[in-house]
Amino acid sequence: MTRSDELFEQAKKTIPGGVNSPVRAFSGVGGSPRFIEKADGAYIFDADGKKYIDYVGSWGPMILGHNHPKIREAVLAAVENGLSFGAPTELEITMAEKVIEMVPSIEQVRMVSSGTEATMSAIRLARGFTNRDKILKFEGCYHGHADCLLVKAGSGALTLGQPSSPGIPEDFAKHTLTATYNDLDSVKAIFEQYPEEISCIIIEPVAGNMNCIPPIDGFLQGLRAICDQYGALMIIDEVMTGFRVSKSGAQGHYGVTPDLTTLGKVIGGGMPVGAFGGRKDVMQFIAPTGPVYQAGTLSGNPIAMSAGLAQMEALCEEGVYEQLAAKTQYIAEGFKAAANKHGIPMAINYVGGMFGFFFTDEATVTNFAQVTKCDTALFAEFYHLMLDEGVYLAPSAYEAGFLSLAHGEEELEATLAAADRVFAKLAKR
């Protein structure tokens, strides 16, 4: 039994499932999770002293790499002044100005402490601003664990939402409508049925919780037009894609302007931070200037703001996103080439600093239905063989992978060499 195995057994005695977020339990791939002791650059190190090339990056935030000196120095300097004040600080203003500078659609922004908090606050604001109750989300898109967002479609796109987790009343879930990602007709049909009841569309511009599914051409622009036609707000959930796909997020990359944007992950530099922002007239509807209530004890925490600012400033350096995109393309195309070499069918998607691969015979994967038909058993085999090779991927067939600027030629080549060996083994099974 490894030290990670021992720690997992110990953790299960005091922590539900032994983890503080379900995907970490390795339920999607089997076996025991690796307990991590430290991380540096492109690498993480487990409790048994094994070193891995990391393509999880704490699920997205570590875009500069782990333990980056600029972020570490900013945090240590901030700690000298105190950990939390529960009062306004100049750092919050600086952070807000930086976000607004980088994302043109955001005129005002409020800091919170998580992505879930950002999305649930943005939806409450949209409902209050429009005086409408219903929201429209997409099958396979994840926006945090707020009650109204843990809902999936029933049979057919026009079916009222059904809870996808116990503990969510059906009377509450009925206000959440679910359409098919990358299918404008399904969205139009729902709006035709509820033309004056839908407050907002919320969308992952690149769906990163059904692996990695970019929008097809015109999809986001079509959603913008539908929102304008029916007087609904468009919320782009950039918790994952914000400052990872491009300097101005996925909305900048694809050329679409939302009414509200939610942010998280990268914005915190590894600290727990979220944010929501957008049009000034909408943001002025939030307390204390408006009637929609939202608050948070640790919102705008000075340590988190310091870490986030250090990361955001580094991301404004010239050529950063071109480097990141080139590395991501190289690793994704390399995975596909290695799989094809050994006769294993694979589809890939990638954009900016995120990627996904699918064990499927289909040439392209663009929606949740296709994702659910992929070979998850083969993924689990592949996952553990790569883990044995010292490559740490997301332990789920439904999660995106993330590159960092710390991934250099050595790490990329070592990863692809490992993949070649693993695919060779899988081809012989």
Curated annotation (Swiss-Prot):
This is Glutamate-1-semialdehyde 2,1-aminomutase. The keyword Isomerase applies. Its EC number is 5.4.3.8. Keywords: Cytoplasm, Isomerase, Porphyrin biosynthesis, Pyridoxal phosphate. The keyword Isomerase applies. GO terms for cellular component: cytoplasm. GO terms for molecular function: glutamate-1-semialdehyde 2,1-aminomutase activity; pyridoxal phosphate binding; transaminase activity. The gene is hemL. One of its GO terms (biological process) is protoporphyrinogen IX biosynthetic process. NCBIfam families: hemL, PRK00062.1. It is found in: Cytoplasm. It comes from the Bacteria. It catalyses: (S)-4-amino-5-oxopentanoate = 5-aminolevulinate. The modification N6-(pyridoxal phosphate)lysine is found at residue 265. Homodimer. It holds the Pfam family Aminotran_3. Transmembrane segments: none annotated. Its cofactor is pyridoxal 5'-phosphate. Pathway: Porphyrin-containing compound metabolism; protoporphyrin-IX biosynthesis; 5-aminolevulinate from L-glutamyl-tRNA(Glu): step 2/2. Belongs to the class-III pyridoxal-phosphate-dependent aminotransferase family. HemL subfamily.
